């Protein structure tokens, strides 16, 4: 979600991968007017909410340290614990849940029913500032 703030885009959840987050930001800038990212709000610890953070937060922005990255209390602990402690099981389940092990065929590909599947790109994680 993009919110047009007074000083730039406030991004609520950064999608699941870098490539889709960057494409979404580019689409908004091209069609709604160019704005810098002024804040990022991540609502919870699932990767589809923070995985694209490096697609909207460049090294230069992060080095400056003036972009608030707002998360719930305990976010880093829970995100790391979820990835480390349950990551293998979640990844294995996702292969079946989202049809990742079924190759696309002549009629398309298997999807998750409520969505057309997960983006297949690079994920990222940035430390919160707030």
PLM regions and their residue ranges:
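Metallo-beta-lactamase
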Residues: 37-50, 77-130
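Solvent-exposed loop/turn segments at secondary-structure junctions
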Residues: 16-18, 45-48, 75-77
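Conserved beta-strand hairpin/beta-sheet module of binuclear metal-dependent hydrolase folds
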Residues: 1-35
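Short, solvent-exposed loop/turn and secondary-structure capping segments
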Residues: 22-23, 52-53, 79-84
